C-alpha cells in the first residue's frame, strides 16, 4: 500500500505556501545582491582620487567623465600604459568594482596602483561616477 505524502495531509493551500517558500529560498541561493551605492558619499570619497584623477580633464590618470560604459584606453589625449590601452575592457559597474579592488591584478601592468578595499566605498564611488556619464 502506498503511503500518502505528509505534505498532502496539509491541504492544498498550505502545500502551495510551502512550495512558494521553498522556491523563494532556493532561488536566492548562490546569488548576492549588491547594495546600491550612495553617490553623495561617493563624491566625498572621490576627493581621495583627485591626487591623480579629475572628472573633467586628464591628469596623472585619465578623466572620469563618462567612464561608466567607456572602453579602457580610449580617452583622447591621455597617455595610457600599453596594458590599459590594449585591455579593451568596457567599464561596467562590475569591471570598475574589480579594477578598484585590485588594479594590478585586474590589468597587470596598469599605471594605477591604489586599491579600494571596502566594498561599500567601491559601490559609493561607482555610484558617483555613474552620475557623470557625459
Identify the role of each PLM range.
Residues 15-27:
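Bacterial N-terminal signal peptides
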Residues 49-52:
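Short cysteine clusters
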Residues 2-18:
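Bacterial N-terminal signal peptides that target proteins for export
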Residues 39-43, 54, 58-93:
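Gly/Gly-Pro-rich "capping" loops immediately C-terminal to redox-active cysteine motifs
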Residues 26-45:
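Electrostatic cytochrome c docking/interface patches
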Residues 92-134:
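C-terminal capping alpha-helices of c-type cytochrome domains
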Amino acid at each position: 500500500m502506498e503511503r500518502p505524502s505528509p505534505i498532502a495531509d496539509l491541504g492544498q493551500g498550505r502545500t502551495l505556501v510551502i512550495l512558494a517558500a521553498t522556491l523563494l529560498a532556493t532561488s536566492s541561493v548562490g546569488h548576492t545582491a549588491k547594495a546600491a551605492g550612495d553617490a553623495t558619499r561617493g563624491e566625498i570619497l572621490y576627493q581621495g582620487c583627485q591626487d591623480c584623477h579629475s572628472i573633467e580633464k586628464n591628469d596623472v590618470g585619465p578623466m572620469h567623465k563618462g567612464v561608466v560604459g567607456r572602453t579602457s584606453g580610449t580617452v583622447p589625449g591621455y597617455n595610457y600604459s600599453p596594458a590599459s590601452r590594449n585591455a579593451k575592457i568596457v567599464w561596467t559597474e562590475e569591471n570598475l568594482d574589480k579594477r578598484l579592488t585590485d588594479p594590478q591584478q585586474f590589468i597587470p601592468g596598469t599605471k594605477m596602483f591604489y586599491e579600494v578595499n571596502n566594498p561599500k566605498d567601491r559601490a559609493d564611488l561607482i555610484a558617483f561616477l555613474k552620475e557623470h556619464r557625459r
